[in-house]
Amino acid sequence: MTQPMPGKPAEDAENELDIRGLFRTLWAGKLWIIGMGLAFALIALAYTFFARQEWSSTAITDRPTVNMLGGYYSQQQFLRNLDVRSNMASADQPSVMDEAYKEFVMQLASWDTRREFWLQTDYYKQRMVGNSKADAALLDEMINNIQFIPGDFTRAVNDSVKLIAETAPDANNLLRQYVAFASQRAASHLNDELKGAWAARTIQMKAQVKRQEEVAKAIYDRRMNSIEQALKIAEQHNISRSATDVPAEELPDSEMFLLGRPMLQARLENLQAVGPAFDLDYDQNRAMLNTLNVGPTLDPRFQTYRYLRTPEEPVKRDSPRRAFLMIMWGIVGGLIGAGVALTRRCSK
């Protein structure tokens, strides 16, 4: 059996924490604790009145409807139909609405779009100080205040964008302006692509029509030459009527003179009057070329998105959070007050 060493209980007693004594000390210094807590809370309250406020507004977007795209949709679909006829388009290509929305999202998340937007706003111009470095830092901060959050279609989450400003009305109005600005830039890019694609299809269709005309003209010239040669032979041999029972369509060119001079003369005059023969495909290409020659009708302000959540004025500010700061700094002040109370007690 182990025997306790002499003096051990006294040593343990010295090392024990006197909980009751601690609470008595804190209770005695309660004025310090409460006072410091209130002082720090009031300082935090005063800070919230002078600190720069941050309010955020959020918008959720999705792809536009056909009506929102206006004339762009019909003209883009016309070009797609041309590609389908010429076997230039894949069967699984995205819809016109998907392509328009993809361009909008690209502009919405673009750094350049955010920069150009702020540079043309009065909100930024009013906060410029005339110092290039300070203004550049301010511009970078404002660019970062527009945050694009891409959607996750596997979880049915749509794209969203958030804008932070110093007042609730500014956050709402600036976000609406930014979304419209990004849509206008997207529409401009899409119109440029439409013009380029339209010009390319026009060149292709002109080349195709010209090729069809050259083929038809070559067939026509060859047919004319064949009949003229057969007519000369018939005149030389004085063949005044058909000397064969074979239908004219089945006669080879080398025996066409057997049809006789009158029939050959009639066929020659008929061919001259009718001219080159074109098929239905040529007529369709000609009609489409006439449409392409008119050129596209561009709408600079068609809408490339639709709202699932329209921006509104926020009712709660993001920063500074008054209640949170007062509670946090009140606790810090209380802890400091407790430290002061303990220090004063020890000094006594």
Curated annotation (Swiss-Prot):
Periplasmic side: 52-322
Membrane topology summary: Multi-pass membrane protein
InterPro entries the record matches: Bact_polysacc_biosynth/exp, LPS_length_determ_N_term, WzzE
Functional note: Modulates the polysaccharide chain length of enterobacterial common antigen (ECA). Required for the assembly of the phosphoglyceride-linked form of ECA (ECA(PG)) and the water-soluble cyclic form of ECA (ECA(CYC)).
Main location: membrane
One term under GO cellular component: plasma membrane
Keywords associated with the record: Cell inner membrane, Cell membrane, Membrane, Transmembrane, Transmembrane helix
Localization per Swiss-Prot or TrEMBL: Cell inner membrane
Protein family per UniProt: Belongs to the WzzB/Cld/Rol family.
Pfam families: Wzz (PF02706)
Lineage of producing organism: Bacteria, Pseudomonadati, Pseudomonadota, Gammaproteobacteria, Enterobacterales
GO molecular function, a single term: protein tyrosine kinase activity
Protein name in UniProt: ECA polysaccharide chain length modulation protein
Functional pathway: Bacterial outer membrane biogenesis; enterobacterial common antigen biosynthesis
Gene: wzzE
Organism: Escherichia coli (strain K12)
GO terms (BP aspect): enterobacterial common antigen biosynthetic process
